[in-house]
Amino acid sequence: MASDELPVAAAATEEEDLVEILDEGSGRLDIARYVDHVRDLAAGAIATFEGTTRDSFEGRRVVELRYEAYGAMARRRLAAILREARAAHSLRRLAVAHRLGTVPAGEASVFVAASAVHRADAMEACRYVIDEVKASVPIWKKEVYDDGEVWKENREFLDRTTTDGTTASSPAPATRPAKGGGCCGRKVRVNES
């Protein structure tokens, strides 16, 4: 190494990536903490995505969102998504966090941060992570209006569903449609043992 070159610290490993699912009552996401986690002297860029609860949807006033999850599976899938992002992009550090329970209008429910030497890697990784979170993590959202409520379907998940009921994250074929209309009607299929 030349005398005028500074050593570059190694990028964080996947074991150092920050994955959090905050249980109901844990309060707001600590955005500064996640940004600080991905901060790295060798990084020339930090990209973030903050998903917030909007106050209206299709002319209806949104009061809050309510999130439920299969926690252990959601954590495993989030960690896998970060590994996939690392495999596809040259990254320094990653963080992803998602709230469960009630998230009032104006507050953040999900946050993604990625750092990289160059901005393109950080921005592309950040987009990849949030797209995969929406498409494949078992977290469900109920939108609560001032005049009712409805479970929301993720278009990203439905876009991946094939005509035989399989998805990118669930390769087992479906055998019959679920009974009744439910929140998803014919889009949900049940495998019989």
UniProtKB/Swiss-Prot annotation:
GO molecular function: molybdopterin synthase activity
EC number: 2.8.1.12
Region annotated Disordered, chain positions: 159-193
Reactions the enzyme catalyzes: 2 [molybdopterin-synthase sulfur-carrier protein]-C-terminal-Gly-aminoethanethioate + cyclic pyranopterin phosphate + H2O = molybdopterin + 2 [molybdopterin-synthase sulfur-carrier protein]-C-terminal Gly-Gly + 2 H(+)
Enzyme class of the recorded protein, top EC level: transferase
Pfam families: MoaE (PF02391)
Subcellular localization(s) per the UniProt record: Cytoplasm
GO terms under biological process: Mo-molybdopterin cofactor biosynthetic process
Residues involved in substrate binding: 118-119, 134, 141-143
Biased composition (Low complexity): 163-178
Pathway: Cofactor biosynthesis; molybdopterin biosynthesis
InterPro entries: MoaE_sf, MOCS2B_euk, Mopterin_biosynth_MoaE
Keywords assigned by UniProt, alphabetized: Cytoplasm, Molybdenum cofactor biosynthesis, Transferase
Domain of life per record: Eukaryota
GO annotation, cellular component aspect: cytosol; molybdopterin synthase complex
Function comment: Catalytic subunit of the molybdopterin synthase complex, a complex that catalyzes the conversion of precursor Z into molybdopterin. Acts by mediating the incorporation of 2 sulfur atoms from thiocarboxylated MOCS2A into precursor Z to generate a dithiolene group.
Family (UniProt): Belongs to the MoaE family. MOCS2B subfamily.
Subunit structure, as described in the record: Heterotetramer; composed of 2 small (MOCS2A) and 2 large (MOCS2B) subunits.
Protein known as: Molybdopterin synthase catalytic subunit
